[in-house]
Amino acid sequence: MNYFILILVAALLILDVNCKKDGYPVEHSGCKYTCWKNEYCDKVCKDLKGEGGYCYINLTCWCTGLPDNVPLKTNQRCNGKRK
C-alpha cells in the first residue's frame, strides 16, 4: 500500500499538469481587450489558446480556459495610468 502511494505521488510530480484559468487577458500595454461583440472576444481568446470567451458587461473580453502563461488583469493600471 505504501509503495502504491509513493508511486502515485511520484507520477503526479513527473507529469506536467497544465492548469487552465479564466479572466481578463491583457494586451502588451497592460490594458484589457475592449469589445462590442462576443465573436471578437471568442476569437481573441482562442488566439491566446483559450477555450473561448465573450464580451462582458463592462465591454471587456472575459476568457475561459486560458493557459498559465497568458497574463491576466490583476490591477487597475493601463499604460502606467490608473484606469
From Swiss-Prot:
Subcellular location(s) of the protein: Secreted
Biological processes per GO annotation: defense response
Keyword field: Disulfide bond, Ion channel impairing toxin, Neurotoxin, Secreted, Signal, Toxin, Voltage-gated sodium channel impairing toxin
Bridged cysteine pairs (disulfide): C31-C78, C35-C55, C41-C61, C45-C63
Domain notes: Has the structural arrangement of an alpha-helix connected to antiparallel beta-sheets by disulfide bonds (CS-alpha/beta).
Pfam families to which the protein is assigned, alphabetical: Toxin_3
Tissue note: Expressed by the venom gland.
Protein family (similarity comment): Belongs to the long (4 C-C) scorpion toxin superfamily. Sodium channel inhibitor family.
Secretion signal span: 1-19
Note: Negative results: has a minimal effect on Nav1.5/SCN5A and no effect on Nav1.8/SCN10A and Nav1.9/SCN11A sodium channels.
Organism from which the protein derives: Centruroides vittatus
UniProt domain LCN-type CS-alpha/beta: residue ranges: 21-79
Function: This toxin significantly slows the fast inactivation of Nav1.2/SCN2A (EC(50)=580 nM), Nav1.3/SCN3A (EC(50)=1310 nM), Nav1.4/SCN4A (EC(50)=530 nM), and Nav1.7/SCN9A (EC(50)=1340 nM). The toxin does not affect the peak amplitude of Nav1.7 currents. On all channels cited above, the toxin requires depolarizing potentials to slow channel inactivation. In addition, the toxin has no or very weak effects on the voltage-dependence of steady-state inactivation, and on voltage-dependence of activation. In vivo, it produces paw licking in mice equivalent to the effects of whole venom.
GO molecular-function term, one example from the UniProt record: toxin activity
UniProt-recorded name of the protein: Alpha-toxin CvIV4
Keyword Secreted belongs to the record: yes
Cellular component GO terms held in the UniProt record: extracellular region
